[in-house]
Amino acid sequence: MGKVIGIDLGTTFSCVAVMEGGQPVVIPNAEGARTTPSVVAFTKEGERLVGQVAKRQAIVNPDRTIMSIKRHMGTDYKVKIDDKEYTPQEISAMILQKLKADAEAYLGEKVTQAVITVPAYFNDSQRQATKDAGRIAGLEVLRIINEPTAAALAYGLDKEGNQKIMVYDLGGGTFDVSILEIGDGVFEVLATSGNNHLGGDDFDQRIIDWLADNFKKEYGIDLRNDRMALQRLKDAAEKAKIELSSATVTNINLPFITADATGPKHIDVNLTRAKFEELISDLVESTVGPVNQALSDAGLKPSDIDKVILIGGSTRVPLVQETVKRIMGKEPHKGINPDEAVAIGAAIQAAVLAGEVKDILLLDVTPLSLGIETLGGVFTKIIERNTTIPTRKSQIFTTAADNQTSVEIHVLQGERPMAKDNKTLGRFILSGIPPAPRGVPQIEVTFDIDANGIVHVSAKDLGTGKSQDITITSTTNLSEEEIQRMINEAKQYEEQDRKKKEEIEIRNKADSLIYQAEKTMKDLGDKMTQAEKDEINREIENVRKALEGSDIEAIKNASEKLSQAFYKVSTRIYQQAGGQTGGATNTGSAGQGTTQDNVYEANYKVEDDDNK
């Protein structure tokens, strides 16, 4: 069995790790970095870019660059590039393909299985979409685990004794808080809460709006209507936010941001940490509610928590750290890398599933209550939030009208009392119920949540034994046909990427060959005949012409001819040198250099040694 990798598929950055020699190791990407921007771009020529190279060109190509796609997982959102529409699953799969390829290059073997993390507060549709993205990328997703739980694994792997910990996870696009009890290899989630639309992107947006509003006041131009200017604002906002984690003031300088009839316009302003904190204070304060909710659900007080673990890049913001300290009454633990902990935890869980790591038991929970719509549009819960998974629960319902022969089961997820205010996961119909007065038929509805947090629902008429069993597939999930089509397209992209890489390597080799040929001709000088020089120059020119075109076979053929021409010249020169030095072997001559003195000296030394 090959290695199972752990992947943190983040809103702004992603990370991949693996267990090696009993220790989790973060895998660097092809560019040498330990995290990869969750950015995908398409050039006007149709080439696909993923990661740092995609992020780098975003300013000049904003319309064809896709960022923070994770925020749209589990929705019917589509990205249109040229005439093609891409789902969030497809874009996420491109990021996963890049991580998979980097892992394969690092490990030197094919990777086909992974554990992928999701925010603890992700609903069923979002979890299913993440699993589909893995399949499209060519990965068998062995387990979907919650990000705070993964971080707790990373923290607690080498800890002894029982501890109650809180994981406060504020990333680029999502916020989670989970409370766990850990000890003796058991990681039990007691409660979880969060907000799927709160993170560093929102902090950036506050800076963007502040810059754009001030610019509009001064010049009457709204930079948010100019895609290229807006992308420059986004980049500047992100940099300013990062700098203000260590500095108290930062300068935002964007020359030639736009122009009007009066000439070019520039931005050159200072943003203080105090002003930044004023801009984001309500966002940071909104994390307090979920923290208190999780504590309440777990039946704990802040003083009962032994350690508070900060995860996610946004927890580097000083105001966030101060807020956590204020509500918990203790300094947060900073002995864990907030960017890498989730991927490390995923790698640990991957090793557990692969049988490499023993004596670890992970008991996670469902973040939201599950149930069905009943008479009057009421949401009737069958499984309460924070129930340990996997779990299975049943409840008996009956018909609402006389002689009702079918019932529609409307499956929902959420905490609101009315069905319409919760998230619809799906609907299905149980038919064939014998006509009877209302209240007589008995219909057993069973909810089954697997270890991935993905829901399966069945309904059974206890009178006839007739049942209907489905895995929830809401309207935003992909059909099997769509997934297969996307898998095939992903393979095509992989093939295109492979060919592109091969083309670059062939071109680089050809360039290198020209350089070596010209250098060697210069070094050999008059040892080459004029005819040989003409032939080599002719072949060099042929390679140069081939490089100007797009025919890779032509470049390979021209390079091969140049190599052959040089081989002929080299062979003649070395044979000639060998003949003039008493018939020394070609190998010996070549090994000692090209001058007669060197060759003669080598042979002389060998004879001297033999005589001894």
Swiss-Prot record:
InterPro entries named in the record: ATPase_NBD, Chaperone_DnaK, Heat_shock_70_CS, HSP70_C_sf, HSP70_peptide-bd_sf, Hsp_70_fam
GO molecular function, one term: ATP-dependent protein folding chaperone
UniProt keyword annotation of ATP-binding present: yes
Organism domain of life: Bacteria
Keywords assigned by UniProt, alphabetized: ATP-binding, Chaperone, Nucleotide-binding, Phosphoprotein, Stress response
Region (Disordered): 578-612
Classification via Pfam families: HSP70
PROSITE patterns to which the protein is assigned, alphabetical: HSP70_1, HSP70_2, HSP70_3
Function: Acts as a chaperone.
HAMAP family per the UniProt record, alphabetical: DnaK (MF_00332)
Name of this protein: Chaperone protein DnaK
